[in-house]
């Protein structure tokens, strides 16, 4: 049976700024006495007598009970309907039947009592929402009565008119409420009750005139972030509206009856991960690898010019880029979408549908927003060293305006966060290559398992994982950088048993996400607990380096040290880290924190006692306010002496040091002066305050609230002192991330039969002995190793034929994966390897159409081939799998032949090409650049089967295959033998027909084209042919 939460029954309205966890013994005894009577017949007034007068209004109680019954309608819908009716008509008792249906009710009463005694930071003062006299089922009203909204609804309306694209989540006491259309949306997503009322702000709905208030639904404040995640997952922007004053401050300022409220946080899918509450145990965070783009696009008839700035809020990485793109292919734009994974696109003007389609085709969750350019001179002063053109600066202003809504602009002010998407020392893999080679996700389930990232990811930290992902997506093309990583891996593998490195590695494994924490500190969205863990982590690293000072000094300063001789990269990392940890004063900041308070679950203690005032270097303001509080407490002690004299009870004391109540037995209540204020009572005792005590308690609450505000200001100042060191801390984290990535590559390289490839820049070459596909091998499949031999001297073009399912596609993917791993700096699965450096890797594998852009499968194939031909260089690696499969045999053969001829024509400028085909006639092309291979097999005949069966050997051997053995694949697919036999007979008849005998004539014609040396004019004809499709 569903059990409602504590907040669904009673909520304290006592405006408290302290927490006292001691239990009220008399309240406990009264509840236990009720339990002994069977737990029934306790009405709401009796509960108020037990718990005191701080329980929420009758209406809120009935409303919560009614909402509970809606959430549990499967089991007790009928009983709840009766109860709601009683509540609305009589509203006098908490029915015994509901208590009986909740066997844990009495236990909950005890929990409520403990919560009441613990106090609360939430003020439920005198807002009309807490003194709501409307029934749960909103009754219809006359026109005269509904012209004026309630104060709370009017406050919501004013906020909503300023944020029409945002769902407002408004704190009302111990709940968060959603109003009007927002409530309708939230109710549907969260499946919670919607209380009827006005649906629109302007009463455009005909039924709105029947209500005075907006329709609404609500959630408990303890479940806020659970529900926020669900809302932003559905791509809604949600703003959390908080009360900005407490009851004590409100009373002292003589403000109106309504609490002031303002937006504290705004969340979207991309910003939630950086703004939500800190949780160091969470592995992968919502929005962790997504980004926000500011983009401008200018189009001509054939080309599209794009400027963009992308910011990843968790890492603080900002990427700027400008490029041109073919308006039909969108290859460059799609590559950037695949790399940077945008979920929010910001523009000044609305993007046309054709552009939106490019984004949503790759990610349906992308949201589009418009923002305006704003002046931000301080930003460009901070970025003076960056080479940004005027258009990128304009986009940066637009992005700044948008992020200011979330208070996430701080990351834009650090020049070290900026980088260009393209650079001279790494290659950019096209989207097709990333997907075809399963770099980040497998193509079956779209999960990380079974991808290259999965094989290579042994990182210990979140920031290390993000950097490794970047390394894999952008392999190096600079020889020295690759060799530096190889040397670092070799050094780590040799030094892995060093005490220092073992301790360092283990410390990394336990590290929080320092990069994310630093940016949350910069944004001001962090928590005190997170700041403590952040500083503690930095201090722990510093302590490790200090304790191993001798080892580090020897490695860094001795000429013959293993580190200095073996790895320049690792040497620089260690040197930079040692310098930072030796000089930083962040461990001193850690000493300024009161650890117990920082980790305390009591939010009030967490705030006002966060600093260790014996160590904190700016304690004056806090100490002054503590003295004010102590003076009031002294006055309360003096007043207690007067009370003792009046009651003639020398041993009397306050009931507690939170509410400062005087407890008198009911039998002696008549002796209490008439001007004393009765606060609450039980069957045994009554509790009072004197007029002076009442005044002093209000004064105490006021000073406590001021202390709270002052502590918040001091915390902000403390955060700013950390942010002032942002650049050097970020550099330190980058060094830690680089080291973590090297550790990960070293772990991968330590696999059995992995070898360090030899690199050369002199000529094109990929030579691998017994190479293996790293992904398939990691899946515990017995993978057959294969050699690779491609060089400028011979075999720059490998034509591969063989049976269907014989392993041709797996083989060419293996070659590309080994090249990528090599240029990341990692060892590879092979006996030996020697490679030149490739500047681009292109793939044309598989087939698919593009219905959104009205492109057939064949047109998509030809467009991609054309892009590859235009974009490849002599240093590129091309993987072409069955080009021409999307059209008829004659056209497919002709196109394949023309493409191969084009590569032959390029001669020394020809890239390395792996060309899979079932057109065996192509193997007749005579050129020293071409080498023919096939995947080996053994033929076998089975009784009753007219066709030839094959046993796959998955071994690449020289020569061509003369049959694709498609009937064998049909058998493996469990097609009935009778059908396959008939298909074989038809095939044999066609082979003997004159139409297929004309293949020899076709080849003679193609050979004549070859003799005329197909040139770039022929390529233009191919392009014209594609455009006419």
From Swiss-Prot:
Assigned GO CC terms: nucleus
Gene3D superfamilies in UniProt = 1.10.1420.10, DNA repair protein MutS, domain I, MutS, connector domain, P-loop containing nucleotide triphosphate hydrolases
Which Pfam families does the record associate with it? Answer: MutS_I, MutS_III, MutS_IV, MutS_V
* Superkingdom, taxonomy of origin: Eukaryota
* One GO molecular-function entry: ATP binding
Q: Where is this region: Mispair-binding domain?
A: 143-270
Q: What ranges does the record give for the region Disordered, renumbered to this chain?
A: 1-142
**Keywords (A to Z) from UniProt:** ATP-binding, DNA damage, DNA repair, DNA-binding, Nucleotide-binding, Nucleus
The record's annotation in NCBIfam families points to:
PRK05399.1
Quote the function comment for this protein. Answer: Component of the post-replicative DNA mismatch repair system (MMR). Heterodimerizes with MSH2 to form MutS beta, which binds to DNA mismatches thereby initiating DNA repair. MSH3 provides substrate-binding and substrate specificity to the complex. When bound, the MutS beta heterodimer bends the DNA helix and shields approximately 20 base pairs. Acts mainly to repair insertion-deletion loops (IDLs) from 2 to 13 nucleotides in size, but can also repair base-base and single insertion-deletion mismatches that occur during replication.
Q: Which family does it belong to?
A: Belongs to the DNA mismatch repair MutS family. MSH3 subfamily.
Q: Mind telling me what this protein is named? A: DNA mismatch repair protein MSH3
Q: Which organism is it from?
A: Kluyveromyces lactis (strain ATCC 8585 / CBS 2359 / DSM 70799 / NBRC 1267 / NRRL Y-1140 / WM37) (Yeast)
């Amino acid at each position: 049976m569903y059990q409602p939460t504590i907040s669904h029954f009673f909520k304290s309205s006592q405006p408290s700024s302290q927490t006292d966890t001691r239990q009220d013994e008399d309240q406990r005894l009264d509840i236990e006495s009720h339990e002994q009577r069977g737990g029934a017949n306790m009405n709401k007034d009796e509960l108020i007598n037990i718990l005191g007068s701080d329980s929420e209004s009758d209406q809120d109680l009935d409303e919560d009970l009614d909402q509970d019954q809606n959430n549990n309608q499967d089991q007790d819908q009928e009983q709840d309907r009766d109860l709601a009716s009683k509540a609305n008509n009589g509203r006098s008792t908490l029915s015994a039947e509901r208590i009986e249906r909740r066997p844990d009710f009495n236990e909950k009463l005890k929990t409520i009592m403990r919560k009441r005694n613990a106090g609360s930071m939430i003020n439920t003062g005198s807002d009309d929402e807490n003194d709501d006299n409307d029934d749960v089922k909103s009754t219809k009203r006359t026109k005269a009565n509904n012209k004026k909204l309630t104060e709370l609804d009017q406050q919501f309306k004013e906020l909503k008119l300023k944020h029409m694209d945002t769902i407002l989540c408004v704190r009302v006491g111990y709940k968060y409420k959603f109003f009007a259309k927002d409530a309708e949306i939230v109710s549907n997503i969260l499946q919670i009750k919607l209380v009827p009322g006005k649906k629109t702000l302007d009463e455009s709905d005909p039924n709105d005139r029947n209500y005075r208030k907006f329709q609404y639904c609500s959630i408990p404040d303890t479940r806020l972030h659970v529900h926020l995640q669900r809302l932003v997952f559905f791509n809604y922007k949600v703003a959390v509206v908080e009360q900005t004053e407490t009851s004590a401050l409100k009373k002292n300022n003589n403000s109106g009856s309504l609490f002031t409220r303002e937006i504290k946080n705004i969340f979207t899918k991309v910003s939630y991960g950086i703004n939500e509450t800190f949780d160091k145990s969470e592995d992968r965070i919502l929005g962790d690898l997504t980004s926000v783009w500011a983009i401008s696009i200018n189009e001509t008839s054939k080309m599209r010019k794009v400027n963009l700035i992308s910011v990843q809020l968790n890492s603080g990485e900002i990427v700027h880029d400008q490029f041109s793109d073919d308006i039909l292919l969108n290859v460059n734009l799609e590559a950037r979408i695949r790399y940077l994974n945008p979920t929010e696109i910001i523009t000044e003007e609305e993007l046309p549908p054709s552009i939106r389609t490019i984004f949503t085709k790759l990610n349906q969750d992308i949201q589009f927003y418009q923002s305006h350019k704003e002046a931000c001179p301080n930003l460009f002063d901070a970025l003076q060293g960056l080479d940004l053109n005027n258009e990128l600066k304009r986009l940066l202003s637009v992005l700044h305006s948008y992020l200011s809504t979330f208070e996430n602009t701080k990351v834009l002010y650090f020049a070290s966060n900026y980088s260009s998407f393209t650079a001279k020392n790494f290659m950019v893999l096209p989207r097709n290559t990333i997907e075809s080679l399963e770099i980040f996700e497998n193509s079956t389930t779209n999960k990380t398992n079974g991808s290259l990232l999965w094989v290579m990811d042994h990182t210990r930290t979140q920031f290390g994982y993000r950097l490794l992902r970047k390394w894999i997506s952008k392999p190096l093309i600079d020889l020295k950088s690759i060799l530096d990583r190889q040397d670092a891996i070799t050094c780590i593998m040799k030094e892995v048993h060093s005490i220092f490195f073992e301790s360092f590695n283990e410390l990394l494994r336990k590290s929080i996400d320092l990069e994310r924490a630093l940016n949350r500190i910069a944004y001001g969205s962090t928590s005190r607990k997170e700041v403590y863990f952040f500083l503690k982590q930095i201090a722990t690293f510093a302590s490790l380096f200090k304790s191993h000072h001798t080892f580090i000094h020897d490695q860094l300063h001795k000429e013959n040290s293993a580190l200095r001789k073996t790895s320049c990269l690792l040497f620089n990392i260690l040197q930079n880290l040692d310098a930072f940890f030796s000089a930083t004063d962040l461990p001193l900041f850690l000493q300024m924190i009161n650890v117990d308070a920082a980790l305390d679950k009591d939010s009030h203690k967490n705030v006002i006692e966060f600093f260790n005032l014996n160590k904190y270097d700016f304690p004056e303001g806090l100490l002054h306010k503590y003295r004010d509080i102590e003076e009031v407490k002294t006055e309360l002690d003096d007043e207690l002496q007067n009370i003792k004299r009046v009651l003639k009870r020398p041993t009397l004391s306050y009931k507690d040091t939170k509410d400062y109540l005087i407890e008198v037995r009911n039998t002696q209540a008549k002796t209490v002066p008439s001007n004393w204020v009765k606060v609450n009572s039980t069957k045994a005792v009554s509790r009072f305050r004197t007029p002076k005590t009442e005044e002093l308690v209000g004064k105490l609450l006021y000073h406590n609230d001021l202390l709270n505000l002052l502590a918040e200001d001091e915390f902000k100042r403390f955060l700013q002192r950390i942010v002032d060191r942002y650049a050097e801390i970020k550099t330190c984290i980058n060094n830690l991330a680089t080291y973590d990535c090297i550790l990960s590559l070293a772990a991968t390289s330590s696999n059995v039969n992995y070898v360090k490839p030899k690199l050369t820049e002199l000529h094109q070459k990929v030579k691998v002995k017994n190479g293996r596909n790293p992904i398939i091998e990691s899946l515990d499949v017995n993978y057959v190793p294969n050699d690779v031999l491609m060089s400028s001297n011979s075999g720059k073009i490998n034509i591969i034929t063989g049976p269907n399912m014989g392993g041709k596609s797996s083989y060419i993917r293996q070659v590309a994966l080994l090249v990528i791993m090599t240029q990341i700096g990692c060892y590879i699965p092979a006996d030996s390897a020697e490679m030149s450096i490739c500047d681009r890797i292109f793939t044309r594998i598989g087939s698919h159409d593009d219905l959104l852009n009205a492109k057939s499968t064949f047109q998509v194939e030809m467009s991609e081939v054309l892009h590859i031909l235009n974009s490849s260089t002599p240093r590129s690696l091309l993987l072409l799998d069955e080009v021409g499969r999307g059209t008829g045999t004659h056209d497919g053969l002709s196109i394949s032949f023309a493409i191969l001829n084009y590569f032959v024509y390029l001669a020394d400028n020809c890239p390395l090409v792996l060309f899979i085909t079932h057109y065996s006639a192509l193997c007749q092309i005579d050129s020293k650049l071409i080498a023919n291979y096939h995947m080996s097999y053994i033929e076998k005949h089975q009784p009753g089967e007219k066709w030839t069966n094959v046993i796959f050997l998955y071994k690449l051997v020289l020569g061509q295959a003369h049959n694709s053995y498609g009937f064998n694949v049909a058998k493996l697919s469990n097609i009935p033998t009778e059908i396959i036999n008939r298909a074989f007979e038809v095939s044999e008849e066609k082979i003997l027909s004159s139409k297929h005998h004309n293949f020899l004539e076709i080849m003679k014609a193609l050979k004549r084209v070859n003799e005329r040396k197909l040139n770039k004019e022929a390529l233009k004809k191919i392009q014209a042919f594609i455009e006419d499709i």
